[in-house]
């Protein structure tokens, strides 16, 4: 399918409901659907190349502000995510040390000591539900975040063809929610983004540098949500 259509968008076969009725009377019927996870903000992006990605932090903050998540709560979420991954304490010093010297005395005062990533201090997050232990992250907060935020095993770009208006507005500094909603309406009317350049051009923001926009047109990560029924029992 990818060879015939390079885009990942709604209306393709993956977006159709999945129904498996079974081949015999003993088989339990199942139904489900695939969700393109790259239409959401990926919390894994807060750390990339053992560095805290400050632009992605600002993107998440803009999204939370739109959703009405308190600044203290979103700051705790950011801190919790960052603590789950190796990261450089002083990436600028590490870059300079890598260029200026290859000597490592093994002491913390060595210029190269700044090039050793800090080990994670918290367990890796696998789902949004793992945020429940954070002060202020209530079931209501998780319910608010769920349509717009995900946690994937790798860094990803946002798919402009499956993203919602709030996520697009958060990803592009200066893009209003109203303008993002207009772009989504145009997209869902059949005018899909064909590449990153097309997306940037349709923003009509000439001051925006295309290289700074991490919005693509495809998805590599999907989540399967399904359920099986047997009599009065249902397994999700």
Predicted regions located by residue number:
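Compositionally biased linear targeting/interaction segments
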Residues: 1-236
